[in-house]
Swiss-Prot record:
Subunit structure, as described in the record: Homodimer or homotrimer.
PANTHER family, per database record: FOLATE SYNTHESIS PROTEINS, FOLIC ACID SYNTHESIS PROTEIN FOL1
Domain of life: Bacteria
Classification lineage: Bacteria, Bacillati, Bacillota, Bacilli, Lactobacillales
Record gene name: folP
Protein name in UniProt: Dihydropteroate synthase
EC number assigned by the record: 2.5.1.15
Source species of the chain: Streptococcus pyogenes serotype M18 (strain MGAS8232)
Job description of the protein: Catalyzes the condensation of para-aminobenzoate (pABA) with 6-hydroxymethyl-7,8-dihydropterin diphosphate (DHPt-PP) to form 7,8-dihydropteroate (H2Pte), the immediate precursor of folate derivatives.
Length: 266
């Protein structure tokens, strides 16, 4: 499997989540020192992660805005330390070009933009400048849709075209339907059912639903975040069967056997 100029063995891969934030919904405050972050990265690599997704700002509902300066202070030391110690691809989870540039300079390989270039109009130019693969995620302000799966497909197709127009090569573009972002539980469920339509848009698809509210709802409610890892793994299997190629998860080990087996059947 290729992500731009990068090659990953197999037809599917796990992206391990590393939140260096104090307020992420699942693991906020757990990895706010470089050493704690490195220890977690080492474990995720041992468990089978092929990409580490580093984020310095929580995107949970109601989270506080973080300036680019503060975000850079959080992520750059961690990215540098990962690059110095491990041979692993790193993605930077940010929608700010200033942070993205600093992360690329520090050693990040991939851009993961939860606003698909809408927040910062220079993100696509930056991706083109660095020949960096970019993941474009569906997002919007309100939970209002004509038909959620079609609307998400239209959005992702339009944002991918905007990236192409800005000089990003097609093989550097990945898409993410954005589970949990501006979507009700019912809308997330409908989008899950229509996931194959997203996978038919002509771009590789990242699947990120780990520990989110819709997983809790599918389990009947009242579960803690870490109690959703088994269901997350089940949904990873479902997504790979629909055509997704990367699953973004907190618990790498719980997903590794699923990815290892299904990768051989894809």
């Amino acid at each position: 499997m290729k992500i731009g100029r990068f090659v990953i063995e197999g037809n599917a891969a796990i992206m391990g989540i590393l939140n260096v934030t104090p307020d992420s919904f699942s693991d906020g405050g757990s990895y706010t020192t470089v050493q704690k972050a490195l220890d977690h990265v080492e474990q995720m690599i041992a468990d089978g992660a092929k990409i580490i997704d580093v984020g310095g700002e929580s995107t949970r509902p109601g989270c506080q805005f973080v300036s680019a300066t503060d975000e850079i202070d959080r992520v750059v030391p961690v990215i540098k330390a990962i690059k110095e110690n491990y041979d692993i691809l790193i993605s930077i989870d940010t929608y700010k070009t200033e942070t993205a540039r600093a992360a690329l300079e520090a050693g990040a390989d991939i851009l993961n933009d939860v606003w698909a270039g809408l927040y910062d109009g220079q993100m696509f130019a930056l991706a083109a400048e660095y020949d960096a693969p970019i993941i474009l995620m569906h997002n919007q302000d309100e939970e209002v849709y004509q038909e959620v799966t079609q609307d998400v497909c239209d959005f992702l197709g339009n944002r991918a075209q905007a990236a192409l127009d800005a000089g990003v090569p097609k093989n550097n573009i990945w898409i993410d339907p954005g589970f949990g972002f501006a979507k009700s539980v019912q809308q997330n469920t409908e989008l899950l059912k229509g996931l194959d339509r997203v996978c038919q848009l002509g771009y590789p698809v990242l699947f990120g639903i780990s520990r989110k509210r819709v997983v809790d709802a599918l389990l009947g409610g009242n579960t803690k975040a870490k109690e959703r890892d088994g269901a997350t793994a089940a949904l990873s299997a479902y997504a790979l069967g629909k055509g997704c190629q990367i699953v973004r998860v907190h618990d790498v080990k719980a997903n590794q056997d699923i990815v290892a087996v299904l990768s051989q059947l894809m």
